[in-house]
């Protein structure tokens, strides 16, 4: 007991001592360089101290911290476990001690006393025999304990060694983890440095690109500045030249009247403003700061002068005082009034109030201004050279007529004036004429005061006429020259104006009004045409969208629903290929290949459940059901899909098959039970389907298809198969309730389940045959019957043809005509088929639409069957043509239980009459004959080669017989 306590007390560390340093204490070493405790020399306290330093460096990593915390928690858990073990051991020892005391009391009936030390024992005392026995037992126990002590010591040593090894392994793992963390940190540092280098390189490249872009922008800015400086220099030179010319011409020239100036320079102002706006936009994109500086420095003096001149003009007009005469003005004012650049600024400053001033103040102009206007018209026979709106110079008549007297009229040619050749001569002549003009103006002012009213009206008319001509000449001619009738108007020798006659005035006024009216009419006509074109474009777009929607509805509404799934066709073709190989294996008696081929056949048809569900979803769709109800289609009793197994028609045939396949009594009993069970379930499903179809038709005819041509109102054919039940249901136009819609949806869902159950019943019956028959018997059944893979697509194709003819026809057909066509189709599908038609041989071509005629001609099953199928198809096509072309005159004659359709259309002269062997007269249009020939010529090639003679189950004996024969059945009904 004490030894165990000492051992465990050594294992428990002190609170200030780390448990991991116990195993690292220095121990005496052997010659091999390994310590007695099993720790190598390399693991010393120094290495551990270095590792702790590394740990302190790694403490910054949160992952390592979490791991260290986990390790500490594990250490604490181990300590608690050891303490719990010690406590449990002590408790066990105490319990064992108490049990021994109780045993002692029971045996000796005395309380247990602790033994005295060996010195106090009296050896001379005589012991009783019981005591002697006890002593002997104690001695034996002591001997046993002494013998067990080395074993316990060995166990303790082994336990201590194991713990030491565990501690060492844990330390090694811990150090390895530290090294791994250090390596990961180094790798992360290297990756981070590599990313920094990449980032620095990218920044360096970006800086270089930015510097290059900045240099390019600076170069562009410098080029633009140079261009602007050149333009400014050119403008300054032009202004200086104009000022020099105006200084020479200022004493000669008198200023134009303000109204005429405003009218002439209005267009010039608009064009220049547009140019300035374009330049400002370009400069704002490139140099927004330089723009403000250059514009402010170049235009401030001009704007100041323009504002002063505008104020003087406005004051003179409002106060009805004449402006300062040009002779009293300063040279700067002469320059201001005569330079076109300054006139532009005047117009720009007074442009907003121009229309108001002209309307309000023309009638109240002072007499002095009117006199100046009349004097200007009389004396100013020449105009100075000044810049036009577009920048060109106008020629002056005065310069040209310097050698002639003042009374002579100016010479013009085609309304255009010639520019002078010598500017020096022009300047001299203008100076000479200026003095004469100044003397005559003052004398004529007093004369013209009385004639202010007449002259003002004439001047206004002339100014309007001049402005219209100026606009036309600016639009039509490329040269910037402008001529006015004031300059070319005839004048007297005294310089007076010859007044226009009243007729000429009326003509000029009417001409101006006509021009304005025609211009307004042209503008309104253009706007109206644009509106009509936009409306037409919107209507064409809408019409195009409606056409697309109608085409998509036609495709998804009827034609595609009638077409079988491509997956179904591929499954049928695969089944046909496998059955051809089964027939070959039967001839060769190869049982192994039969089993393999049957397995392939069942795998190929394993997809039938999903395909059936998709086909049923198409048929049960509410849109398809509404189409069928609108057409008046009624589902007849379905032809038995498994007529070869179930039904009374298969009794005789099935008995022959049993004899040929050597079916046992047990197999025949199972087959008969399967047939009866199939018939019961099939009849129950058919009855349920008829009830559901009746309810759905009632819902459509009473709630949705409430039309004038409703079959219930007219008493049409669709109510007859239901025994008049549909006609008894009331018709209502009230809106549908939610309960009615839910009930209708539930009926559609139950119809879908009925279809799926019926199809799965057929397919499950086929699968259950394989569990009853042997592989050879099943192969014989599939090859002889081949009912599943000989899926007859003729009825589906005929339905598709009927629907496509209805959709593609131009004339509108009602649901009554469609119902008649479909009734005939349903009558043909319900004919009683013989066993020869049911038991078909395998077809050796892939199914494609529009191939029925080629199929009937290529497979020689008898002339009667071929002519019968042709008659049925031609009758259906002719019935559709009759319903489309002759809605009013439909004459149907029935002869020899066959439909003979006669086209009574006066416009169609292409009627082909053909007499069959069974006295069946079938008339078809030329379009139908051509379609038959085209289908025969353009038939697709066969996918599979025809089988060899060995593969045929019953080879023909003669050429006139059928290619594939079956045993003649005496009880089979004759073909119709």
UniProtKB/Swiss-Prot annotation:
One BP annotation, GO: regulation of gene expression
One GO MF term attached to the UniProt entry: DNA-binding transcription factor activity
Keywords tagged on the record: Coiled coil, DNA-binding, Nucleus, Transcription, Transcription regulation
Tree of life domain: Eukaryota
Annotated GO CC locations: nucleus
Subcellular location: Nucleus
Entry function: Probable transcriptional regulator.
Identification of the protein by name: Probable basic-leucine zipper transcription factor Q
Organism whose genome encodes this protein: Dictyostelium discoideum (Social amoeba)
């Amino acid at each position: 007991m004490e030894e165990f306590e000492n051992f465990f007390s050594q294992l428990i560390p002190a609170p200030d001592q780390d448990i991991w340093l116990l195993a690292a204490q220095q121990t005496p070493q052997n010659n091999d360089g390994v310590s007695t405790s099993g720790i190598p020399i390399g693991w010393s306290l120094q290495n551990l101290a270095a590792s702790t330093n590394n740990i302190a460096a790694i403490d910054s990593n949160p992952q390592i911290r979490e791991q260290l915390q986990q390790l500490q928690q594990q250490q604490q858990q181990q300590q608690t476990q050891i303490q719990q073990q010690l406590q449990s051991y002590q408790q066990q020892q105490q319990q064992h001690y108490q049990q021994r005391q109780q045993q002692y009391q029971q045996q000796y009936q005395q309380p247990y006393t602790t033994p005295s030390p060996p010195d106090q024992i009296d050896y001379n005392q005589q012991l009783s025999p019981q005591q002697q026995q006890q002593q002997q037992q104690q001695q034996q126990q002591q001997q046993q304990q002494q013998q067990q002590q080395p074993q316990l010591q060995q166990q303790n040593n082994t336990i201590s060694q194991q713990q030491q090894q565990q501690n060492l392994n844990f330390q090694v793992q811990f150090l390895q983890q530290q090294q791994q963390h250090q390596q990961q940190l180094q790798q992360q540092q290297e990756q981070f440095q590599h990313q920094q280098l990449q980032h620095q390189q990218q920044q360096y490249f970006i800086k270089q690109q930015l510097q290059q872009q900045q240099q390019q922008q600076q170069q562009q800015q410098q080029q633009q500045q140079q261009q602007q400086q050149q333009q400014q220099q050119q403008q300054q030179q032009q202004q200086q030249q104009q000022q020099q010319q105006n200084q020479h011409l200022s004493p000669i020239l008198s200023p134009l009247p303000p109204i005429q100036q405003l009218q002439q320079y209005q267009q010039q102002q608009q064009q220049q403003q547009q140019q300035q706006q374009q330049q400002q936009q370009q400069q704002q994109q490139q140099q927004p700061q330089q723009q403000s500086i250059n514009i402010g420095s170049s235009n401030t003096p001009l704007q100041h002068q323009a504002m002063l001149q505008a104020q003087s003009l406005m004051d003179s007009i409002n106060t009805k005082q004449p402006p300062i005469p040009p002779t009293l003005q300063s040279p700067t004012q002469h320059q201001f009034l005569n330079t076109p650049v300054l006139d532009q600024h005047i117009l720009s400053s007074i442009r907003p109030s121009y229309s108001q001033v002209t309307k309000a103040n023309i009638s109240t102009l002072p007499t002095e201004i009117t006199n100046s206007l009349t004097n200007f018209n009389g004396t100013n026979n020449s105009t100075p050279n000044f810049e036009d709106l577009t920048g060109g110079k106008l020629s002056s008549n005065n310069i040209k007529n310097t050698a002639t007297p003042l009374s002579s009229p100016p010479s013009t040619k085609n309304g255009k004036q010639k520019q002078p050749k010598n500017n020096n001569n022009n300047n001299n002549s203008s100076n000479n004429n200026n003095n004469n003009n100044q003397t005559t103006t003052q004398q004529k002012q007093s004369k013209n005061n009385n004639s202010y009213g007449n002259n003002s009206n004439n001047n206004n008319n002339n100014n309007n006429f001049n402005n219209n001509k100026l606009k036309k000449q600016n639009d039509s001619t490329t040269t910037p020259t402008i001529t006015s009738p004031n300059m070319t108007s005839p004048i007297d020798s005294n310089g007076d104006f010859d007044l226009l006659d009243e007729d000429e005035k009326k003509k000029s006024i009417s001409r101006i009004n006509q021009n304005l009216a025609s211009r307004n009419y042209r503008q309104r006509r253009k706007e109206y045409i644009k509106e009509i074109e936009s409306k037409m474009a919107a209507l064409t777009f809408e019409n195009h969208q409606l056409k697309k929607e109608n085409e998509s509805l036609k495709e998804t509404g009827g034609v595609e629903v009638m077409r079988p799934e491509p997956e179904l066709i591929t499954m049928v073709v695969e089944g046909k290929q496998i059955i051809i190989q089964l027939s070959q294996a039967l001839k060769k008696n190869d049982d192994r290949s039969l089993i393999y081929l049957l397995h392939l056949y069942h795998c190929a048809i394993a997809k039938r459940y999903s395909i059936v569900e998709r086909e049923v979803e198409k048929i049960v769709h509410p849109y398809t059901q509404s189409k069928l109800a609108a057409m008046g289609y009624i589902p007849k009793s379905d032809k038995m899909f498994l007529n070869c197994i179930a039904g009374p028609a298969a009794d005789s045939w099935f008995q022959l098959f049993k004899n040929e396949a050597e079916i046992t009594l047990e197999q025949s009993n199972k087959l008969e039970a399967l047939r009866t069970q199939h018939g019961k379930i099939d009849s129950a499903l058919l009855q349920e389907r008829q009830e559901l179809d009746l309810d759905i038709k009632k819902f459509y005819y009473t709630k949705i298809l409430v039309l004038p041509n409703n079959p219930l109102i007219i008493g049409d054919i669709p109510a007859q198969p239901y025994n008049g039940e549909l006609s008894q249901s009331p018709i209502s136009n009230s809106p549908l309730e939610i309960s009615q819609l839910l009930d209708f949806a539930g009926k559609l869902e139950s119809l879908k389940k009925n279809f799926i159950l019926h199809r799965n019943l057929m397919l499950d019956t086929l699968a259950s045959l394989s569990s009853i028959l042997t592989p050879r018997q099943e192969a014989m059944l599939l090859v002889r019957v081949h009912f599943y893979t000989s899926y007859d697509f003729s009825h589906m194709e005929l339905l598709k043809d009927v629907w496509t003819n209805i959709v593609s026809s131009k004339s509108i057909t009602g649901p009554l005509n469609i119902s008649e066509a479909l009734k005939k189709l349903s009558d043909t599908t319900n004919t009683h088929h013989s066993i020869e038609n049911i038991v078909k041989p395998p077809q050796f071509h892939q199914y494609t639409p529009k191939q029925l005629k080629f199929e009937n001609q290529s497979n020689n099953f008898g002339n009667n069957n071929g002519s019968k199928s042709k008659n049925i198809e031609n009758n259906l096509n002719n019935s559709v043509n009759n319903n489309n072309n002759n809605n009013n005159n439909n004459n149907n004659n029935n002869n020899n239980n066959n439909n003979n359709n006669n086209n009574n259309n006066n416009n169609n002269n292409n009627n082909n009459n053909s007499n069959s062997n069974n006295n069946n007269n079938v008339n078809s249009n030329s379009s139908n004959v051509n379609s038959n020939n085209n289908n025969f010529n353009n038939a697709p090639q066969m996918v599979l080669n025809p089988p060899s003679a060995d593969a045929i189950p019953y080879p023909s004996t003669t050429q006139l017989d059928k290619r594939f024969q079956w045993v003649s059945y005496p009880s089979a009904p004759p073909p119709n």
